[in-house]
């Protein structure tokens, strides 16, 4: 399994992402469904920001919108077959989790990562959804946005590809969510939930048996 999970944006050492994902000639995609509750113009700008940042690293990418695959899991499987790296940007973890479920991407990513068929990369919400559970993140993200947008309740289970909760923006001065993240950590400690904190600039790198913070 290959993962590059940053606290915020590309992190301070994106060369690790390039080493992990670059060079195999396959395309990269940006998944921005954590921004699906944002106004269309804001969402579009957020996609362009990620595409430009990846292009600066030599990783040309295009958006893959999971909403286009709601109820079409097999078509998504076919389209992901040619993808070498998926970059899942931050935003609302509950919105992203819902889109992963409706499209079938949650199980597909599990299968593809187990087969070492792609790199899963991203930051903030894009990393948090890999946790065993999203409980506690309602202190940071608006879980009710799922109901307002889709008329369905939010999902609370994560993809459980990580053995502990991923906690970004921890004690990261200047980030607007760092105070709320402190409350998340306090809850996890009180409830005995295993977690891993990352400061902005850091990333969790998983490359087969190797796991480290970069």
Task: Annotate the PLM regions.
Residues 1-94, 189-214:
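Extended, subdomain-level signal for the structured scaffold at the beginning of enzyme domains
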Residues 157-201:
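Conserved anion/nucleotide-ligand pocket segment
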Residues 83-90, 112-126, 176-187:
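A short, terminal or domain-edge coil/loop segment
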Residues 98-172:
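Class I SAM-dependent methyltransferase SAM-binding "motif I" and its flanking Rossmann-like core
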Residues 14-16, 40-41, 97-99, 130-133, ...:
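Short glycine-/acidic-enriched loop or helix-start segments at secondary-structure transitions
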Residues 64-68, 93-99, 125-136, 153, ...:
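Short flexible/disordered coil segments
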């Amino acid at each position: 399994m290959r993962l590059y999970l940053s606290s915020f944006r590309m992190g301070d050492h994106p060369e690790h992402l390039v080493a992990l994902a670059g060079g195999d000639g396959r395309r990269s995609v940006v998944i921005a469904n954590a921004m699906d509750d944002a106004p269309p113009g804001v969402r579009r700008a957020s996609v362009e920001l990620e595409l430009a940042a990846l292009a600066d690293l030599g990783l040309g990418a295009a958006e893959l919108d999971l909403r286009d695959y709601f109820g079409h899991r097999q078509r998504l499987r076919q389209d992901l077959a040619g993808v070498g790296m998926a970059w899942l940007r931050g935003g609302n973890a509950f919105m992203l989790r819902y889109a992963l479920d409706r499209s079938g991407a949650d199980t597909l990513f599990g299968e593809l990562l187990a087969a070492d068929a792609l790199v899963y990369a991203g930051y903030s919400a894009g990393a948090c959804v890999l946790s065993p559970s999203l409980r506690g993140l309602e202190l940071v993200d608006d879980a009710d946005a799922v109901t307002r947008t889709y008329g369905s309740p939010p999902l609370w289970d994560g993809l459980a590809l990580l053995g502990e909760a991923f906690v970004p923006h921890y004690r990261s001065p200047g980030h607007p969510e760092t105070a709320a993240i402190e409350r998340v950590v306090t809850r996890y400690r009180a409830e005995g939930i295993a977690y891993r904190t990352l400061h902005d600039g850091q990333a969790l790198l998983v490359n087969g048996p190797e796991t480290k913070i970069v």
